[in-house]
Amino acid sequence: MMNQNTGQSTTLFTTKELVLISILSATLTSGKLVLSFIPNVEIVTLLFIVYTLVFGRRRALMVSVVFTTTEILFWGFSTWLIVYYILWPVLILITSAFRTRIRGEYGLAVIAGLFGLTFGFHFAVVESFFYGLSYGAVYWVRGIPFDILHGASNFITVLLLQKPLTTLLTRLSRNYF
């Protein structure tokens, strides 16, 4: 759509960006699905960090909306969708805020590890609003072993794969985008 006064396009995303967002979202969804048989081991956190570093906050935020909406279509509506619509953008904003301050993969691995470690707590807060404080507390305490696994797997995954994936996607984005 053209702006009548300036003659410039007023679209939010170009066609190339929409295709990119679709491909990145599909990669997230399929990556999560492939690893779903292993409790709390996932590549979604890694990919959101890499997408933010390579493609920027704006595109990564749109990917998070598409990914979460796709997850709802797969798994149905529940209280978890509130957390997904909040936490993935928060991870993107944190990554974006620290992208110039953190140069090595260790800093990003710590962010990913802490994110995984606190993931269940955020769900417990939302569950408390719907089912009561005691339910939320039990939900969180029973999930602590899974949160520890989630944090450790996020740390290791980002530590090992962030740099090569960032390098690869940066090179591909220069060639195709």
Range-by-range predicted roles:
Residues 2-8, 17-24, 63, 83-128:
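Short helix-perturbing small/polar motifs within transmembrane alpha-helices
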Residues 2-50, 58-62:
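Hydrophobic transmembrane alpha-helices
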Residues 29-41, 66-99, 131:
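Interfacial aromatic-anchored transmembrane helix boundaries in multi-pass membrane proteins
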Residues 46-49, 72, 92, 120, ...:
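Hydrophobic transmembrane alpha-helices of multi-pass small-molecule transporters
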Residues 51-57, 70-75:
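Interfacial segments of multi-pass membrane proteins
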Residues 53-56, 94-102, 163-170:
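Structural signal for the C-terminal ends of transmembrane alpha-helices
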Residues 81, 104-177:
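Membrane-embedded alpha-helical hairpins and interfacial helices in multi-pass inner-membrane proteins
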